[in-house]
Amino acid sequence: MGQDQTKQQIEKGLQLYQSNQTEKALQVWMKVLEKGSDLVGRFRVLGCLVTAHSEMGRYKEMLKFAVVQIDTARGLEDADFLLESYLNLARSNEKLCEFHKTISYCKTCLGLPGTRAGAQLGGQVSLSMGNAFLGLSLFQKALESFEKALRYAHNNDDTMLECRVCCSLGSFYAQVKDYEKALFFPCKAAELVNDYGKGWSLKYRAMSQYHMAVAYRLLGHLGSAMECCEESMKIALQHGDRPLQALCLLCFADIHRSRGDLETAFPRYDSAMSIMTEIGNRLGQVHVLLGVAKCWMARKVQDKALDAIEKAQDLAEEVGNKLSQLKLHCLSESIYRSKGLQRELRTHVVRFHECVEETELYCGLCGESIGERNSRLQALPCSHIFHLRCLQNNGTRSCPNCRRSSMKPGFV
């Protein structure tokens, strides 16, 4: 298959894919892969296969194609191709919740010599790195990466990237419980879709609606949460987007739990769990089990709650998500306190405080925890976050967290 023919077939596959004929598109691309001898064509078609498998939630396949793409890039001996393939490898690992590997591949991308692609893809590398740091509950590093990605987006007028970063920032602020910002950023993303997204994939609209739904639920606006989640789910079903379907089902379950309708919540948690397990989203499974545990606690069925907590704890430790571990220790603490089991209670209290230290989820000015309840937060230029009221009362001459770090004695 010659260069021109390869190009035509890739284009044909893209048209099929965009008209939701995914399986036909995959067949066309696989044929190019089998018969094409042109290395640049092979590289491009592997990129299409990586993206398609990502959107379908076939993350192990995605990783497989990303690895083949790296070999192809090495054959081309071109730093631009190498950067793009390492970014795909980073993203594949991010989807599989292999966050340390993601960070390592992102650092490889950033360490490559200055390339043409570097200017275009640097923001996407920073975004993927931020998502991985967030997956590990390293909040300062996550925020630093997201802000870097946002700068790339603004400097290059890349509104698509800006939209994706705004969704990640929504998720960041939902986790640290500044619900005002958790809603502001996905609303900004939805605005970008409305203003610039006429030719974009509908997934951008679906993504912003999903993050808005999460924030509305946390704020207690359950009707608005349901509307946004339904809109997102409709697009996810149209496009066969399994990962987003799972997230929407989890959000629906959380909305019903917030309404006290546990009968309706349970089957939605089950459906979300089924897809999360199928696609390999282990952190998603942790979030489902957290919701299930809260349902059992509301019903005062503590043993079933502890079962869910135990499964979630194993998964959370496996992926390294400290915030989930912190929440699970908090739930366990409450159960063991009510049972009067002092030894178990002590264990979870100690682990809870260790997780607070590890995540640095406390305000460096007042010493109180961050992320315990909805509070307005503000980041300093170093990306450490504080209560807004504390910064207003104390001023911001320099960051107390950075000051403390610089005063720690080094190893001699």
Curated annotation (Swiss-Prot):
What about PTM?
A: Ubiquitinated by the BCR(KLHL8) complex, leading to its degradation.
Q: What are the residue ranges of zinc fingers typed RING-type?
A: 363-403
> What positions are modified (Phosphoserine)?
S405
Q: Which UniProt keywords apply?
A: Cell membrane, Cytoplasm, Cytoskeleton, Lipoprotein, Membrane, Metal-binding, Myristate, Phosphoprotein, Postsynaptic cell membrane, Repeat, Synapse, TPR repeat, Ubl conjugation, Zinc, Zinc-finger
CDD domains, per this entry?
RING-H2_Rapsyn
Q: Look up and give the membrane topology term.
A: Peripheral membrane protein
- Subcellular location, in the record's words? Cell membrane; Postsynaptic cell membrane; Cytoplasm, Cytoskeleton
Q: Which InterPro entries match?
A: Postsynaptic (IPR001237), Postsynaptic_CS (IPR018293), RAPsyn (IPR052480), Rapsyn_myristoylation/link_N (IPR019568), TPR-like_helical_dom_sf (IPR011990), TPR_rpt (IPR019734), Znf_RING (IPR001841), Znf_RING/FYVE/PHD (IPR013083)
Tell me where the TPR repeats sit in this chain.
Answer: 6-39, 83-116, 123-156, 163-196, 206-239, 246-279, 286-319
Lipid addition (N-myristoyl glycine) is recorded at G2
Q: Name one GO molecular function term.
A: acetylcholine receptor binding
Which GO BP terms sit in this record?
Answer: establishment of protein localization to postsynaptic membrane; motor neuron apoptotic process; neuromuscular junction development; neurotransmitter receptor localization to postsynaptic specialization membrane; positive regulation of motor neuron apoptotic process; positive regulation of neuromuscular synaptic transmission; regulation of postsynaptic membrane organization; skeletal muscle acetylcholine-gated channel clustering
User: What's a single GO CC term here?
Assistant: membrane
PTM-bearing positions, type Phosphotyrosine: Y196
**Record's Pfam families?**
Rapsyn_N, TPR_8, zf-RING_2
Functional description taken from the UniProt entry: Postsynaptic protein required for clustering of nicotinic acetylcholine receptors (nAChRs) at the neuromuscular junction. It may link the receptor to the underlying postsynaptic cytoskeleton, possibly by direct association with actin or spectrin.
The record comments on the domains as follows: A cysteine-rich region homologous to part of the regulatory domain of protein kinase C may be important in interactions of this protein with the lipid bilayer.
Q: Which family does it belong to?
A: Belongs to the RAPsyn family.
Name by which UniProt lists this protein: 43 kDa receptor-associated protein of the synapse
Native organism: Mus musculus (Mouse)
Q: Gene name on record?
A: Rapsn
